[in-house]
C-alpha cells in the first residue's frame, strides 16, 4: 500500500526539481528523511506559528481498525484538505488531532508533534487546536454578535471588555458577518430561519477563532452548503491561513474545481490508510503513471475517488519521506505555549454571571418557555378555579379538595416536560463549550438554577393566586404563603427531574417517553390511588421516592391544620369528622409539612447533582 507525500513548501519553479514523495503505511518515524537544503534558510516561525506532524497514527474501536498508520505534515499559512469516501476515518483523524478522542485507544507508536515536539498530554491539543464540527452547535436565540461576545467572555478571561469588543468586531469584519451581526443565529428551519447556512458556518468558525488558536480543524465545513457558500467558506479559510499564519486542516467529501485553487495539499484516505499526501500536481502525476487520463468533466480529486483502489496498489520505485519538523527548525519561543497548563479555577463568580445573563436572554426569547408557560399557569389556575369554585366545608368538599390537590400536582409536574427540547438543544452546545474549557459544568448548573428559580417562582404565583382564592381554600395568609411555596417547590423538583432525564436521554422522543413513564409511576405510588398499607412490599420504595407524595401531604396539612377543630361532617351523634380527623386518617401532623419541604428541597438538589455528574462524564468523552 503506497501513499504520495509532498509538502507544497518543497515545490520550486522548476518542475524537474519536484519529487513525488511517498511512504509506505508501515514506515516508522525513524525512516523520515530530511527535506531539501532550501529549508535551512527559512525564517523561524513567530510565536503561535505551528507546524503539525502526525506519525504512524493507528486507532481501533472494538477490534475494528479505523485508522491505519496515518502520517502527515501540515504547515502554517496553508490548507491541508483531508479527502476520502464516507466512513474512511476523516472525522476521526481530525478529532484525534484536536484531542477529542481518548488517546488511550491509540497505538503506542502513534505520535502528534508540534514544531518537532511530541505532545504527551492530549488535553493540550484542545487548547492549541480550534475544532469546528460538522454540525453548527449554536444557540439559535442569540444574535451573531451576542454569540461571539459570550464566546469572548468565556475564552478571553484576561482581556478587558474593550479588548474583547475589538476582537469580536475584527472577526465580524474578517468573516463578513457585519451585516447580520444583529440577526438571530436560528436553526435554519421554517420556524426559526435565522441566518443562512453559510453565515451560520462562518459564525461557528468565528467562535473557534475568538481565542486565536494556531491550528484550526474543520469537519466537513462545506457540508450542506451550496456551491457559492462552500466557495466563500473555503476562500475565507485560505485568506485567514495566510494573513494570520495559521495551520488549517479540514475534511471535504468532493471539492469543486474552484475550491481546489485555495487548497495547498491533499491527504487522501481509503479504509483508514493514506493513499496520497501532497499537492494536486503530484496527484495528477501519480494518476498518469498508473495509465489513467482524467476526464475533462472531473477534477483530479473526483477522479481519484473513482480509482481509489488502483491508487491503493500503486507502488513507486523510490520512496522518500519528509518530516515537517525539517520545514520549521525547532522553535523555542513556542515551548512555553505548548507545555503551559491551565490553572485550576475555583468557583468563578464572573463565569457564572455570564452564564446567568445568557440564560435570562434565552428564557425571555423562548416563546414556548416564557410566554406559553406563564399563560399556561394563569389559564390552568383560572380553569381549575372555575371547576372547583367555592368548595363546601363538608365531607364531599374534603374529597374534592384532595382531588384538586392531586390534579394540580399532576398538571404542575407534567407541564415542565415542554422544557425538554430546550435542554436537549442546549446540551449539544454545553458539551462543545465545556469540553474545550470555556466554563465548567458546575458553573452551568449553578447559573441554570439562579436564572430559572425566580422565573419558576413567578409561574407558581400566577397559578396559585387564582386557583387558591377562587376555590376558597384555607383563608389565612400563612396558609396561602405555604401553598405558594409548595407549588414553587413542586415546579423546582419537576424542572430538576426533567433536567436530569434530558441528560440521560439521546433524543426528544425517548426523553419524553422516559419522563412520562417516571411521572406516571410517581403518581401511582403517591398514596392518592393506593394507600401506603396496600402497596406491595417490592414497590414500597416507590412510595418514598415519589415526587407526588410529599407535596400532596404538605397541601393537605396546610389546608386542615389551622382548621383541625372545625367540623366537616356532622350527624345525630354530633361531629363525625373534624380537620384533625382528616389528617389522622392519612397519618399526618403539623410537623409533616416542614419535613416534606426539606425533602422536596433535597429532591431538587439531588436531581441537579445527578445531572451534573452525568454531564461531567459526557463532557469528558465529548468529541465536539
Curated annotation (Swiss-Prot):
Domain ABC transporter: 52-296
Gene3D superfamilies hit by this protein: P-loop containing nucleotide triphosphate hydrolases (3.40.50.300)
Pfam assignment, any one: ABC2_membrane
Transmembrane region(s): 369-389, 402-422, 450-470, 480-500, 511-531, 595-615
Compartments, record wording: Membrane
Alphabetically ordered keywords of this record: ATP-binding, Membrane, Nucleotide-binding, Transmembrane, Transmembrane helix, Transport
SMART domains, per database record: AAA
Sequence ranges assigned to domain ABC transmembrane type-2 in this UniProt record: 350-560
Membrane topology: Multi-pass membrane protein
GO molecular function: ABC-type transporter activity; ATP binding; ATP hydrolysis activity
Similarity section: Belongs to the ABC transporter superfamily. ABCG family. Eye pigment precursor importer (TC 3.A.1.204) subfamily.
Name of this chain's protein: ABC transporter G family member 23
Species for this entry: Arabidopsis thaliana (Mouse-ear cress)
Gene name of this polypeptide: ABCG23
Amino acid at each position: 500500500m503506497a501513499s504520495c507525500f509532498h509538502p507544497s513548501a518543497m515545490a520550486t519553479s522548476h518542475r524537474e526539481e519536484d519529487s513525488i514523495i511517498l511512504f509506505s503505511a508501515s514506515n516508522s518515524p525513524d525512516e523520515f528523511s530530511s527535506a531539501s537544503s532550501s529549508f535551512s534558510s527559512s525564517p523561524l516561525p513567530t510565536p503561535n506559528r505551528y507546524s503539525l506532524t502526525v506519525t504512524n497514527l493507528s486507532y481501533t474501536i472494538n477490534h475494528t481498525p479505523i485508522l491505519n498508520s496515518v502520517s502527515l505534515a501540515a504547515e502554517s499559512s496553508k490548507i491541508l484538505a483531508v479527502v476520502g469516501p464516507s466512513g474512511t476515518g476523516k472525522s476521526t483523524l481530525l478529532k484525534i488531532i484536536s484531542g477529542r478522542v481518548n488517546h488511550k485507544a491509540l497505538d503506542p507508536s502513534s505520535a502528534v508533534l508540534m514544531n518537532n515536539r511530541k505532545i504527551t498530554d492530549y488535553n493540550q491539543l484542545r487548547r492549541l487546536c480550534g475544532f469546528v464540527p460538522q454540525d453548527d452547535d449554536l444557540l439559535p436565540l442569540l444574535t451573531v454578535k451576542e454569540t461571539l461576545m459570550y464566546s469572548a467572555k468565556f475564552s478571553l478571561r484576561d482581556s478587558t471588555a474593550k479588548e474583547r469588543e475589538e476582537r469580536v468586531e475584527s472577526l465580524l469584519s474578517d468573516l463578513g458577518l457585519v451585516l447580520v451581526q444583529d440577526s438571530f443565529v436560528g436553526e435554519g428551519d421554517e420556524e426559526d430561519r435565522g441566518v443562512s447556512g453559510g453565515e451560520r458556518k462562518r459564525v461557528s468558525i468565528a467562535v473557534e477563532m475568538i481565542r486565536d488558536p494556531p491550528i484550526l480543524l474543520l469537519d466537513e465545513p462545506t457540508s450542506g452548503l451550496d456551491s457559492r457558500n462552500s466557495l466563500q467558506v473555503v476562500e475565507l479559510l485560505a485568506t485567514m491561513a495566510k494573513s494570520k499564519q495559521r495551520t488549517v486542516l479540514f475534511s471535504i467529501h468532493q471539492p469543486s474545481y474552484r475550491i481546489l485553487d485555495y487548497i495547498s495539499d491533499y491527504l487522501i484516505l481509503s479504509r483508514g490508510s493514506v493513499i496520497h499526501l501532497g499537492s494536486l500536481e503530484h496527484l495528477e502525476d501519480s494518476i498518469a503513471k498508473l495509465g489513467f487520463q482524467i476526464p475533462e468533466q472531473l477534477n483530479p480529486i473526483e477522479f481519484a475517488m473513482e480509482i481509489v483502489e488502483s491508487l491503493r496498489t500503486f507502488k513507486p520505485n523510490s520512496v522518500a519521506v519528509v518530516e515537517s519538523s525539517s520545514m520549521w527548525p525547532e522553535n523555542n519561543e513556542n515551548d512555553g505555549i505548548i507545555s503551559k497548563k491551565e490553572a485550576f479555577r475555583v468557583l468563578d463568580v464572573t463565569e457564572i454571571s455570564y452564564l446567568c445573563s445568557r440564560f435570562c436572554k434565552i428564557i425571555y426569547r423562548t416563546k414556548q418557555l416564557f410566554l406559553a408557560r406563564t399563560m399556561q399557569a394563569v389559564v390552568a389556575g383560572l380553569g381549575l378555579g372555575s371547576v372547583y369554585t367555592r368548595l363546601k366545608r363538608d365531607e364531599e368538599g374534603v374529597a374534592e379538595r384532595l382531588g384538586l390537590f392531586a390534579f394540580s400536582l399532576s398538571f404542575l409536574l407534567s407541564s415542565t416536560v415542554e422544557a425538554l427540547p430546550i435542554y436537549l438543544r442546549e446540551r449539544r452546545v454545553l458539551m462543545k463549550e465545556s469540553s474545550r474549557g470555556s466554563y465548567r459544568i458546575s458553573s452551568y448548573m449553578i447559573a441554570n438554577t439562579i436564572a430559572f428559580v425566580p422565573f419558576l417562582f413567578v409561574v407558581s404565583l400566577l397559578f396559585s393566586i387564582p386557583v387558591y382564592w377562587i376555590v376558597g381554600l384555607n383563608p389565612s395568609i400563612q396558609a396561602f404563603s405555604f401553598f405558594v411555596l409548595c407549588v414553587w417547590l413542586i415546579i423546582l423538583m419537576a424542572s430538576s427531574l426533567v433536567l436530569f432525564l434530558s441528560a440521560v436521554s439521546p433524543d426528544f422522543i425517548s426523553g419524553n417517553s422516559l419522563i412520562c413513564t417516571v411521572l406516571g409511576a410517581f403518581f401511582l405510588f403517591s398514596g392518592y390511588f393506593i394507600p401506603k398499607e396496600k402497596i406491595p412490599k417490592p414497590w414500597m420504595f416507590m412510595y418514598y421516592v415519589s415526587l407526588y407524595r410529599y407535596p400532596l401531604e404538605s397541601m393537605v396539612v396546610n389546608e386542615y391544620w389551622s382548621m383541625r377543630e372545625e367540623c366537616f361532617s356532622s350527624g345525630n351523634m354530633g361531629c363525625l369528622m373534624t380537620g384533625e380527623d382528616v389528617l389522622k386518617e392519612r397519618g399526618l401532623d403539623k410537623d409533616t409539612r416542614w419535613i416534606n419541604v426539606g425533602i422536596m428541597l433535597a429532591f431538587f438538589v439531588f436531581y441537579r447533582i445527578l445531572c451534573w455528574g452525568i454531564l461531567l462524564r459526557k463532557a469528558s468523552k465529548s468529541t465536539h
